[in-house]
């Protein structure tokens, strides 16, 4: 999987950062992309990335503050203007359906494709056999969620050398054996593919947080993930101000990553008060607690 950050600023865009939007490319022979939040200007950011509105098949909104949703109506209309006919699924908190319906109706807009809007609560939202998405409630002045995305475990590798030693030559039967099936050879012997497979490879796990102050749910959401994306709106010394507005500091995000056993922390949602140089100080605050902390930048793409 790949994550591309289209916007990493909190509240207001700056000259170097747009407001929140993250694209997930699930890959695994999939052509569609998933979008997490859609702040104002997200379409413009897409012009500088590999994503286009027509490639988006699912949108997950964390909460209804403007810096996370004001880009949504334009993106929906652009899909229609481009002649897109593929369905689009939107997931978000209560009110997202009214927001979408109202903005389209009052602007005289419509969609040329099936649009399905799901108002969510805590729990698993989907399981398509390859990926699951689960929503966790967070602490913010409005209803807000974080999303945990998990790949299914992948089959182990087939030990071709052992099979050859057993007299099984490469051929069409190998595909069945890779699936762990039992096959019958021409000489009447049966071979169980599961006996020649290595242990399953664990699927990747990602946690994408919406805006949040400290909450016990955070560690559960991020438990053992490969990548944790968490807001670091303000520096550690401004915890009272950050928490009072439903936000987190560098120190608090790093503590969640450490306590959850995450492998990487991607810091995002920076107050526009911080310059690029000052963000390095924020990074140092996180790394002092959780060394595998990284600054997200607009257009940064990481492989999970």
From Swiss-Prot:
- Top enzyme class of this protein? hydrolase
Which GO MF terms does the UniProt record name? Answer: 3'-tRNA processing endoribonuclease activity; exonuclease activity; zinc ion binding
Highest taxon of the lineage: Bacteria
Which sequence ranges are marked TM in the entry?
Answer: none
Query: For this protein, what is the EC number?
Result: 3.1.-.-
Required co-factors? Zn(2+)
Which residues take part in binding Zn(2+) 2? 67-68, 211, 269
Q: Which UniProt keywords apply?
A: Endonuclease, Exonuclease, Hydrolase, Metal-binding, Nuclease, tRNA processing, Zinc
Give me the residues that bind Zn(2+) 1, please. 63, 65, 140, 211
Q: Active site: which residues? A: 67
Instruction: Give the cofactor note.
Output: Binds 2 Zn(2+) ions.
SMART domains noted in UniProt: Lactamase_B
Q: What's this protein's function?
A: Zinc phosphodiesterase, which has both exoribonuclease and endoribonuclease activities.
On assembly, the entry states: Homodimer.
Family membership: Belongs to the RNase Z family. RNase BN subfamily.
Name the HAMAP family on file.
Answer: RNase_Z_BN
Recorded hits in PANTHER family, A to Z, give: ZINC PHOSPHODIESTERASE ELAC PROTEIN 1
Name of the protein this chain belongs to: Ribonuclease BN
Give the gene that encodes this protein: rbn
């Amino acid at each position: 999987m790949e994550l591309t950050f289209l916007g990493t600023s909190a509240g207001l865009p700056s000259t170097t950062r747009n407001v929140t939007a993250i694209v997930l490319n699930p890959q695994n022979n999939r052509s569609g992309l998933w979008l997490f939040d859609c702040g104002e200007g997200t379409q413009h950011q897409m012009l500088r990335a590999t994503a286009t509105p027509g490639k988006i098949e699912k949108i997950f909104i964390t909460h209804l503050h403007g810096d996370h949703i004001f880009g949504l109506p334009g993106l929906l209309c652009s899909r229609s203007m481009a002649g897109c006919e593929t369905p689009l699924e939107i997931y978000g908190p209560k009110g997202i359906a009214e927001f979408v319906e109202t903005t389209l109706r009052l602007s005289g807009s419509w969609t040329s494709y099936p649009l399905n809007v799901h108002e969510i609560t805590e729990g698993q939202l989907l399981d398509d056999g390859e990926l699951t998405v689960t929503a966790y409630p967070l602490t913010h002045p409005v209803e807000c969620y974080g999303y945990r995305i998990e790949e299914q475990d992948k089959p182990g590798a087939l030990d071709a050398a052992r099979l050859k030693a057993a007299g099984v030559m490469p051929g069409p039967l190998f595909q069945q054996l890779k699936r762990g099936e039992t096959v019958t050879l021409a000489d009447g012997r049966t071979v169980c593919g599961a006996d020649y497979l290595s242990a399953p490879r664990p699927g990747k796990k990602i946690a994408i947080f919406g805006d949040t102050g400290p909450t016990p749910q955070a560690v559960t959401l991020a438990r053992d993930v490969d990548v944790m994306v968490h807001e670091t709106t303000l520096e550690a010394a401004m915890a009272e101000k950050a928490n009072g507005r439903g936000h987190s500091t560098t120190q608090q995000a790093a503590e969640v990553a450490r306590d959850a056993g995450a492998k990487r922390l991607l810091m995002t949602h920076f107050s526009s008060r911080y310059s690029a140089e000052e963000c390095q100080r924020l990074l140092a605050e996180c790394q002092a607690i959780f060394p595998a902390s990284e600054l997200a930048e607009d257009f940064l793409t990481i492989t999970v």
